[in-house]
Amino acid sequence: MLFPTEFDVIVVGGGHAGTEAALASARMGAKTLLLTHNIETLGQMSCNPSIGGIGKGHLVKEVDALGGAMAAATDESGIQFRILNSSKGPAVRATRAQADRILYKAAIRHRLENQPNLWLFQQAVDDLMVEGDRVVGAVTQIGIRFRARAVVLTAGTFLDGKIHVGLNNYTGGRAGDPAAVSLSARLKELKLPQGRLKTGTPPRIDGRSIDFSKLDEQPGDLDPIPVFSFLGRAEQHPQQLPCWVTHTNERTHDIIRGGLDRSPMYTGVIEGVGPRYCPSIEDKIHRFASKESHQIFLEPEGLTTNEFYPNGISTSLPFDVQLELVHSMRGLENAHILRPGYAIEYDYFDPRALKASLETKAINGLFFAGQINGTTGYEEAAAQGLLAGLNAGRYVQEKDAWCPRRDQAYLGVLVDDLVTRGVAEPYRMFTSRAEYRLSLREDNADMRLTEIGRELGLVDDARWDAFSRKRDAVSRETERLKSTWVTPKTLPPEEATALLGKAIDHEYSLAELLRRPGISYDGVCSLKGGECAPTEPLADDPVLLEQIKEQVEIGIKYQGYIERQASEIERNDANENTRLPDGIDYREVRGLSFEVSQKLNEFRPETIGQASRISGVTPAAISLLMVHLKRRGLGRRNGTAAEATEQGDGTVPTQQ
């Protein structure tokens, strides 16, 4: 049956990538259909009940700055909030929250059901409708055909998923949900390059059986309680709960070693590669054999359940081994396991077969986002989903794709890494992956992206008004500090000594004083009995006020470093965005080695910058390529791309 309504964009999958994709597409005005196998699992947290962390929190803030849902949903469902690396510089500080699974799903579903231009439909997708080299719709398991001009596929771990517990295995997309076997087979027919990856989850524990008196308590930050969204308020948070800490021990490790002969990972049953930075407990014991103990965090799953998530013991060992290893740890001697841990293998597709817009190179209008691209984590999925949904909407509107640059957003780093380098293991975001991380901080994600989001149609009036007030206040206050001066005559020596350690000997602007180590914005404003404070309040809202003060202080203190980084970006920008012709045959480029020309022909980079980051492509090869383009008159910063780069929005032409 052909469904009577035709849509602009169809999103397949209702996880973190799919929900952000559907919301982004609909916000742009595209008539969007979200197809999910089960409406009750929209926004499901399949593994850890947490959002954020180092690098990941930066992505969440960027999604929020572009009008996405993840940060706001976390503020409404978060039961513990912490700022990680709080004693370090602002570039690596990151927000992390424990979320109530039920509240998080409810917050996401509420947004989906109340988003204009968005329709929901519960049916698993078995097939894609493809005509020639373009996608035209999707087919459900009962044969309903939905037509659309673009499809965003966000299948998570469901593509030919196989669950392993010991040497037992069965098909499944996650525990309790069926795998997408037919869709996986159909995608194989499309000849898209693919592979297998693996991830896992720990057993869940009944909190009533935990002896908390033997555990170390880990409270969240309480003064103040952090928020994730730039529009968030601590009053939105539900009741706050602590986490708890225990440790593995030698007995635990002996139990695990004794079970490796029945581990699917160590008997060759699992072929997929697992995440390096979220390893199973079996991997930890094997890779860090000399380590006597590993920290395990017991994280509450929610306010209305006794279920706990033991972060650190992801495993696919047989259940009897899981039970024994849990009981070997302090405080868990009598723990009751509610759900066994398991590993899951699934299909992914080589992201080097994607454009930077996340559209597949082989099939026009087909976009991939999330774990299907070889990433791991809710945050990485949500960021890709927003970008894919945005660009699917722009595709059907015949507008240029938006592809954020590496110097513009962690989202740009994520996508560039995927489409140029590919993945050999599940990809996780870290701040260390960003070469311009001093400029790509959590605190300035809105300053970097909200204006772009507004131009793209992603940001509503409420967010834009709040951002505009903040941006203008930061600018005014920064200029005031630069133009307000104190002299030895106007600043009493005792007051200067109390703040600065000694009296001043010549004239200083307040900005120059603030630039000194250990001097805060509030400290500078307190000088001269408070006369150095602004005469008018920077903001009536206390949360907005703190954001403004933070931006002013960081901007002044790190001005020199940020300006140097901006100069470096400008130097690199000339070649970074030079577009490569679609039909170029790299075998014709004089001087290129066979290996380099083969890789360039295989991966078809879109820009010189992408080409330079392909493994094996040397700086010398890039120089030869630039000479070739100049001789042939082919190298160009495509009109739209060049203009967009100068405007800072990263738009590149859509090839349709």
UniProtKB/Swiss-Prot annotation:
It holds the Pfam family GIDA. InterPro entries: FAD/NAD-bd_sf, GIDA_C_N, MnmG, MnmG-rel, MnmG-rel_CS, MnmG_C, MnmG_C_subdom, MnmG_C_subdom_sf. Belongs to the MnmG family. Homodimer. Heterotetramer of two MnmE and two MnmG subunits. SMART domains: GIDA_assoc_3. NAD(+) binds at residues 274-288. PROSITE patterns: GIDA_1, GIDA_2. It is found in: Cytoplasm. GO terms for molecular function: flavin adenine dinucleotide binding. GO terms for cellular component: cytosol. This is tRNA uridine 5-carboxymethylaminomethyl modification enzyme MnmG. FAD binds at G13, G14, G15, H16, A17, G18. SUPFAM superfamilies: FAD/NAD(P)-binding domain (SSF51905). It comes from Burkholderia ambifaria (strain ATCC BAA-244 / DSM 16087 / CCUG 44356 / LMG 19182 / AMMD) (Burkholderia cepacia (strain AMMD)). PANTHER family: GLUCOSE INHIBITED DIVISION PROTEIN A, PROTEIN MTO1 HOMOLOG, MITOCHONDRIAL. NAD-binding protein involved in the addition of a carboxymethylaminomethyl (cmnm) group at the wobble position (U34) of certain tRNAs, forming tRNA-cmnm(5)s(2)U34.
